[in-house]
Amino acid sequence: MARILGVDIPNDKRVVISLTYIFGIGKSTSQKILKLANIDENIRVNDLADEQIAEIRRVALNFVKANGEKLQLEGDLRRTVAMDIKRLMEIGSYRGIRHRRGLPVRGQRTKTNARTRKGPRKTVANKKIETR
């Protein structure tokens, strides 16, 4: 497995797909990185030369988005997302409250469904009717 930006990317897949295993790189960013590095996106990772892997590393580290910002990847991006969620919870916004309660944040229904966010069902038993 080739190691790029601290992530082992799979050898048996095409380069354009393998780069998406890095947190913060999707398919379109992967295509842009490969275009800047002058590497065909249909090549498999195990067919890449060491110089090509080094070029992908260099381009990915120095990649600048269309708005002029540097691309955040892996740990930095995870930290930024976690801090954003923490900030929402601290200021007490609606989204922060939903995060704190472990409920869906983006307006989904919760009467039914939302099991991924709420966890497994907590069954409540009916009260027994006392007979004399």
Curated annotation (Swiss-Prot):
Q: Which SUPFAM superfamilies match?
A: S13-like H2TH domain
Q: Where is this region: Disordered?
A: 101-132
Task: Please verify whether the record's keywords include Transmembrane.
Answer: no
Say if the entry is tagged with keyword rRNA processing.
Answer: no
Give an example GO biological process: translation
Question: Per the record, where are the segments of Basic residues compositional bias?
Answer: 101-125
Name any one GO molecular function. Answer: structural constituent of ribosome
Query: What keywords tag this UniProt record?
Result: Ribonucleoprotein, Ribosomal protein, RNA-binding, rRNA-binding, tRNA-binding
Gene Ontology CC: one annotated term: small ribosomal subunit
Cited function: Located at the top of the head of the 30S subunit, it contacts several helices of the 16S rRNA. In the 70S ribosome it contacts the 23S rRNA (bridge B1a) and protein L5 of the 50S subunit (bridge B1b), connecting the 2 subunits; these bridges are implicated in subunit movement. Contacts the tRNAs in the A and P-sites.
HAMAP family per record: Ribosomal_uS13
Q: What family, per the record?
A: Belongs to the universal ribosomal protein uS13 family.
Q: How does it assemble?
A: Part of the 30S ribosomal subunit. Forms a loose heterodimer with protein S19. Forms two bridges to the 50S subunit in the 70S ribosome.
Indicate what this protein is called per its UniProt record: Small ribosomal subunit protein uS13
**Gene name, please?**
rpsM
